[in-house]
Amino acid sequence: QFAVLREALHIVDIGAATIEDVDTVLKAGMGLRYAALGPFGVADFGGLDTFDHINTYLNAELDDSKVGNKRLHEMVEAGKLGVKSGQGFYDYSGDKADEAIRERDRMYIELAKVLYFNKK
């Protein structure tokens, strides 16, 4: 949680966005996705190959190890790319991908109803 707050404070401090803007973006974007899927589910839906590509250059800026995450890279090398390959952090083989997509969309809709459409 503090890592997100640290970055949010930096965005506000450099004048890139207001406090309200940052809260709105996180609630409607990352917050909504993480509430429905968690970080591993979000990565599976986004494609582990995409996250691994980002991992190769961005992790060095965020972590003292100066290299990307080994587990993620090994999964991509093994063809485990998430939903699009049928296997990632979770199993999406057979009909499981379609079921996961339907469930994700259902959760997004329910969360949006609660957060944005039930205001009194």
Where are the model-predicted features located?
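Short Gly/charged-rich anion-binding patches and loops
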Residues: 6-7, 70
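NAD(P)-dependent Rossmann-like dehydrogenase/reductase catalytic/cofactor-binding core
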Residues: 13-14, 19-120
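Structural/interface elements that position substrates and couple domains in central-metabolism enzymes
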Residues: 1-5
